[in-house]
Amino acid sequence: MKGKNVQLLFALVVIILLFPTGASASPHAVSVGKGSYATEFPEIDFGGINDPGFRDQQGEPPATIYRSDRVTGPMQTNSWWGSLAVDRFSMNQYPHPFSVRHRAEGLHVFYDAPHNMVVHENREAGTWHIHGAIGTDFTIKHSGTANFEQAVVDDYNDWYVRGLLENGAHQMAITYGVGSPYIFVEYEDGSAVLDFDIAPDVWEMNGHVIGFSTHDHKHYAAFAPPGQNWSGIGSKTLTNNADYIAIAKLPEKDGNMLAKFEQYAYSVVRDAVADWTYDEATGTVTTTFEVTTEAKVQGAPDGTIFALYPHQYRHLASSSENQLLQNYQYEIIRGTMIGLEGKRFTTELTYPGVLPSLPDLGDYDRERLIGYLHDATSDYPTGSDTYELGKYIGKLATLAPIADQMGEYELAEQFRGELKDILEDWLQATNASGQLKGKNLFYYNENWGTILGYHAAHSSATRINDHHFHYGYFVKAAAEIARADQEWAKSENWGGMIDLLIRDFMADRDDDLFPYLRMFDPYSGNSWADGLATFDAGNNQESSSEAMHAWTNVILWAEATGNKALRDRAIYLYTTEMSAINEYFFDVHQEIFPEEYGPEIVTINWGGKMDHATWWNSGKVEKYAINWLPFHGGSLYLGHHPDYVDRAYEELRRDIGSTDWNLWSNLVWMYRAFTNPDDALQQMEASIDDYGLFDPGNEKIIERGSTKAQTYHWIHNLAELGRVDPTVTANHPIYAVFNKNGNRTYIVYNFSDSPITVQFSDGHSIQVEPHSFNIGNGDGPTNPDPSEPDLKNPYERIQAEAYDAMSGIQTEGTDDDGGGDNIGWINDGDWVKYERVHFERDASSIEVRVASDTPGGRIEIRTGSPTGTLLGDVQVPNTGGWQQWQTVTGNVQIQPGTYDVYLVFKGSPEYDLMNVNWFVFRANGQGNGDSHTHPDYTAGIRGITGNEVTIFFAPTTEARYVDVHLKVNNGQQLNYRMTERNGEWERVVENLSSGDVLEYSFTYEKLGPQYTTEWFTYSR
């Protein structure tokens, strides 16, 4: 008996050594630290849930992937071209400016021209849609076959794909990409055929090169190698015996443009790489888009013509500006694309920082907040799937740091303890017996190269949908645990499985298990939520904010675990997606949405349309708030454009008719707090306590993924901190800056084990102890005294020659009104600096007095340095001469504070750009608030302070005098002689109140006679 006991003990030791706690004993599971994932599809435990919809979700993606032998390993999903891999041919794809579709007969090519686009309001449903037509301008076919058997993915890179249509030996390989106005076609066992429903107008015929227009005036070119001439001119079918052709979408019917496109028509793009860097010292994310081409004829250049989206050309690096083809423009669903030629171009964006939570700076009732925290312990998951459970653990991860701040350390550990229990369950694929579980596990599908969580939801398994949304919540929970327990987060413990989930939705290049950046489109700048994209409108994404939530959580997790490469990759994704959201979801610059489109947000962005509707209903709040939730320490980008925040809020309030929000009231309050926290507090206090303990069936006041505690904490913090200030950056990634009435607050969190000193771009610095927020506001000016004599007033004209430093410019006497000097001899890259410009309030525009006898250029307004934060820009035209002066206007986003302002000049290096005489900033409520233009003058009212306005009159011909006639609230008429300043006449009116109505007119002298204007009305 003793010998047998020894043998049994030895066997138990072997088992323990082979399968330590948390490791997998199943041959169908792979151990990762203390966790594991399944490699065999599990037998799903439905837990008594018989709903067919739920059961249908618990499957796998399609077994068949349409790809050639050239494409091996993990398969790219969630792309704009994804349907090519899962359809026998494909659904519509949107490689802007084209839309294309593979069919049995060939490739259908279409350009969704502006006249095809429609804005449709469904008033009964409460939805809006911006959509184009689905059609065919012509079909690219193969001379050797009338019908192909299938289309497959033959190759792909960061933004191009090669589709292969095949029927035995008859093959047609088609290379096309988003942002490419070319389609490259290569033939096997046959040659080119272009088929039209109506014969095209061939307006340029040069043998192997033709320019043609469709019956509805869309302009194209077709290129074959020299010596291979086109046939069938005048008919509905054009043919060419070449085994290679290129199709180009021309911006206009223009022979010179056709010649430019011919230069690159024989340079087939074989690779395209978006290579990015993050400069931690400056917060700059630089992305270089580069192509590698193969010459189809001798001498073809290694380059192409790109079509840039607004989010790209708005942030184009100065080194790439001279490559722009400004007149080469395409109008698409996302606004205007602009052409650029070359091998590469570069964009520069500014990373604004994220936080693990807001700090403990709110003026709140701490006992009340603690009560809300304890109330939240009664909350529970609203589902067993990766999304509903994800929302629950995301909620717990938000509550834990607030509990820490309130000194409720046991409660904070209770929240984190529950997070650990849930994650550790899900991160193990096997049960205590070593067998695969039937739920609460992750399974690796080798066919596609993806991790699938069960229970699944929203087609996260069957279509590979929403992985960044769902798994982002798991990473949020892990990041909060790691903030307090670094041991738990180590790879040999549970961190390895968290890293695996992250790799699934944002893997690096050359990952053995997963495709590169599964969810993200480097060229379009946004994520795509659908894995397969089998829709006629292409791929789509609804909750852009949950994408930003995912990138935020990876930044926090990577910073907590010391993974700098992962952190920087997430910063690239966060910063780039932010720029796309501002354009295509919010239209903060008011240049994307058509004028007839009513809402201030697009809820779902598609390749081929834009929807103001959700996937599940048409609730008014949901159509906005699905692109806000969940609020967290990375949500501060939502407040970067306060003018837009106010527009969106007011449009939502107007649509509902009151502040009695129909659902998710707390999300509206939290959004409102970005610009008007006092109003947000009033709304919150009026109804937050009408919500008792957690009730998932009642989301009118509190959305199920949030809590009263977080809502109360968030709004009170913003009431004390003020507005988010993105104009100041830091040399550390976990930070935020706020500005309240000109006083900045600097927030930093330090995940490391040592104290750090963080430098800000405005000269401020902060020391932060390990594993904590900073205490106090650090060193450096945060609230400069406006009375200091050396401060410059941006709302009065600043003479250009009164600079504090410059590079490259000279001064000369000016003929402009007022005399004095102007600056001139300005070339690309020159700049002037104006120190200590003090903005007492937001500025939204700048006026610059300019003259130019060349095509002009652009003036960038930056702070801190010539390459500092970009606040706005102004386009300068040819004015007709070096002393022919015009006033040009541009938009800026400047919050209160004191800055060193730089005017940086951009344009062609081949000539002098412009002269500048003066510039002036306009505050919100100035400039366009009340302005009237007449051939003789521009006149109106600009706001100055809370109780003052300036009435201005700018005559087009010099006036010897201007009088203003004024009535306030229909009172006695007052008459004043106005004061002339550099050709513009002004009169300040004081002691006004909100709601006052001003009626005013002018009498002015012009070349001897005097004239009187009509009366104008302005309401305060």
Swiss-Prot record:
Which segments carry the region annotation alpha/beta subdomain?
A: 252-350
Localisation: Secreted
- Keyword check for Repeat: no
Q: What is its main location?
A: secreted
Under InterPro entries, the record lists: CBM56, CBM6, Cellulose-bd_IV, Endo-beta-glucanase, Galactose-bd-like_sf, GH81_C, GH81_N
Q: What is known of its domains?
A: The CBM6 domain binds the non-reducing ends of beta-glucan; this domain may therefore target the enzyme to polysaccharide termini in damaged regions of the plant cell wall susceptible to catalytic attack.
Described purpose of this protein according to its UniProt entry: Cleaves internal linkages in 1,3-beta-glucan. May contribute to plant biomass degradation.
PANTHER family on file: ENDO-1,3(4)-BETA-GLUCANASE 1, GLUCAN ENDO-1,3-BETA-D-GLUCOSIDASE 2
This protein's name: Glucan endo-1,3-beta-D-glucosidase
Q: What organism is the protein native to? A: Halalkalibacterium halodurans (strain ATCC BAA-125 / DSM 18197 / FERM 7344 / JCM 9153 / C-125) (Bacillus halodurans)
